[in-house]
Regions:
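ABC ATPase nucleotide-binding domains
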Residues: 1-61
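Phenylalanine-focused residue identity feature
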Residues: 16, 40, 51, 58, ...
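Residues located in well-ordered beta-strands
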Residues: 46, 58, 72-74, 128-132
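C-terminal boundary and immediately downstream tail of ABC-type ATPase nucleotide-binding domains
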Residues: 53-78
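Non-catalytic connector elements of ABC transporters
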Residues: 68, 77-193
């Protein structure tokens, strides 16, 4: 259905306002999308802008399939560098994120850290988790993991090789400081923006 609507829009060359509760439709059909909650606009942007730079926890949680993972974390600043700590794992944020947080003079605080499932990597030493479910998707495996008291989804590429993660197996996970989103615990606002 989406392909037909896109073709129709291109053929008649006019502006469409399409209202949907299906975020996948919004992402695939819209040149620009408006995300609303309780009658209030949360964010306006291109699908890619909204996906890459969610304004708040609500937007981060509804845009993207599977949805973004959220961790309880600690944002720290030492020697002008911001780090986030989840459990026993500390990651330094990217230079771009450092600049944006510093520009807003963000203080050390407990935060909610958001990381998309395809931005989490398995490693030898990281945030520890237990596999609850392993879903083979062909080119990837979707792991449903319990880590730090949270349900986490990790997308692991199979690279053509069979990937087997039995229920109950232990995994360690890490994420890059360039892909983590830092949200205020009180307001839910993305602290970079």
């Amino acid at each position: 259905m989406s392909a037909e609507i896109i073709k129709l829009r291109e053929r008649i060359d006019t502006t469409f306002i399409y209202v949907t509760h299906d975020q996948t439709e919004a992402m695939t059909l819209g040149d620009r999308i408006v995300i609303m909650k309780d009658g209030f606009i949360q964010q306006i942007g291109t699908p890619q802008e909204v996906f890459d730079h969610p304004a708040n926890l609500f937007v981060a949680g509804v845009i993207g399939v599977p949805q973004m993972n959220f961790f309880d974390a600690r944002l720290s600043r030492r020697d002008g560098k911001y780090t986030v700590t989840v459990g026993s794992v500390t990651v330094e944020l990217s230079p771009e994120k450092q600049q944006r947080l510093a520009a807003h003079n963000v203080a050390e605080q407990d935060v909610t850290l958001g990381v998309r499932p395809d931005h989490i990597m398995l490693c030898a030493d990281g945030v520890k988790g237990t596999v609850d479910v392993s879903e083979m998707m062909g080119s990837s495996v979707h792991l449903h993991v319990t880590a730090e008291g949270k349900d986490v989804i990790v997308i692991v590429p199979t690279n053509g090789a069979a990937a087997h993660f039995p229920m109950g197996s232990e995994v360690n996970m890490i994420f890059g400081g360039n892909v983590a989103h830092v949200f205020d615990n009180t307001t839910g606002k993305n602290l970079e923006w």
